[in-house]
Amino acid sequence: MFKWLLKHRSKPTPLELGIFDQKVSFWKPFLLFCPALLTTFLFTLVPFFLTLQKGFSHNEDIYRVDSQQFGFQTFANLFSESNFILGLRNSFLYSIISLPLTIVLAIIISSAIVFVYRKLARGFWQTVFFLPYVTSGVAVSIAFIYILDSSSGILNNIFHVNIKWLDSGERDTFNALWGILIFGIWKNMAFNVLVISTAMLSVDPTLYKVANLDGAKPIRQFFKITLPSIRPTLIFLLTLLILGGMQVFPISLFNGNDSEAVTNGGSTILLYIFQKIRDQNNNFAGAATLVLFILGVCYGLVLRNGFRLIEWAQWKIKRHYVQTKLNLV
């Protein structure tokens, strides 16, 4: 019986390859990739090329359909429009001012949350600061309309001032821009706090233990351990804030009335594009879209290369300091 069992025992099955090691024909993964490829082509590439075509064409005669010519005349006319210049000013200043304020405030709040040692309290504060992100945008806009109201607004009552934030009636005023900044920073704070606090909590605690043994103070640990460890997260958030800053669309603060936004100095590039598309002036809308795209790309490149330049300068300074110490020894 024992010999029979040995003879008929099950043979070991050969080791199977993992799913990433198996040879698969080309068409199977390509078919899975086709929906995403088709969506990107239809809703990204095609609109982009149509925008290029509209932006670089202008009508010599508005009464003739076949009078469109290729050139830069639309861009020249675009920069001569006061509404576009106003929107360009507000969009640029919003992105320049809101970016550092949002990042710095989010880092400070996230640091406070991380240093709360009780897990229950930590999760509670994360939830509190994330609530604005999941709150209805309409409800938030209505709340800020009442907060920024010139006659009975909470902000004016707290500081005992009478600033017309959203209803000054002046095109060149900066009051509307400050109101848009307050609204935008508060709205973007929730997501940034959640992401940065999660990144801080994922830093290896061994690094802090070693730093404590070396006598490093908490502030030094923050700048030498925490910030370098969450650098990829900060770069990701900077990219999102750059795109969001240039594409600010504050029409909800003006009760959905774009003309009221322009009249009170609250116009932006995206609001200008919205007006031109509604008026079926696609050439100006396409040119403004290309200007917005170029500004966003240039702004992002300047910031990213600027951070790399700062890091390189810090490395050179530290290297020079170490070499000086070694030479003294």
UniProtKB/Swiss-Prot annotation:
Gene Ontology CC, one term: plasma membrane
Swiss-Prot/TrEMBL GO biological process terms: transmembrane transport
Record's keyword terms, sorted: Cell membrane, Membrane, Transmembrane, Transmembrane helix, Transport
Topology class, membrane: Multi-pass membrane protein
Species, as recorded: Mycoplasma pneumoniae (strain ATCC 29342 / M129 / Subtype 1) (Mycoplasmoides pneumoniae)
Annotated S-S bridges: none
Domain named ABC transmembrane type-1: residues: 88-303
Pfam family for this entry, one: BPD_transp_1
Domain of life: Bacteria
Record localization: Cell membrane
Transmembrane segments: 30-50, 96-116, 128-148, 176-196, 234-254, 283-303
Main location, first listed in the record: membrane
Protein name as catalogued: Probable ABC transporter permease protein MG188 homolog
Function field: Probably part of a binding-protein-dependent transport system. Probably responsible for the translocation of the substrate across the membrane.
InterPro entries, A to Z: ABC_transporter_permease, MetI-like, MetI-like_sf
Lineage: Bacteria, Bacillati, Mycoplasmatota, Mycoplasmoidales, Mycoplasmoidaceae
Family, as annotated: Belongs to the binding-protein-dependent transport system permease family. MalFG subfamily.
